[in-house]
Amino acid sequence: MDETDYQPDQVLDCRKLSCPVPVLKTKHAISKLEIGGILEVICTDPGSVKDIPAWTKQTGQELLEIVHEDSHYEFFIKKIR
């Protein structure tokens, strides 16, 4: 596992979930965070590599990093608004 400098306020496990469920769960989870909070989203769906960055851009959240592990992806998202 890659080391990251981000300390998430919440971790959302979306492994084995297909589009659009990871994006819907991400939207719900980020709505509960304070501004400046960091959400880590873990996904196995390859479509999430396009879907989650598109969602962050559309909603004005900040995608800090995408980490690709052997079996999953980790997205670090900072709540901006």
Residue ranges with predicted function:
Residues M1-Q7:
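Short, compositionally biased "basic patch" segments
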Residues P8-R15:
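Short amphipathic
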Residues D9, G36-E40, H72-E74:
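Intrinsic-disorder/low-complexity, polar/charged segments enriched in Ser/Thr/Lys/Arg/Asp/Glu/Gln
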Residues E74-R81:
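Core SAM-dependent methyltransferase catalytic element
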Residues L17-I66:
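Amphipathic, hydrophobic secondary-structure cores in small proteins
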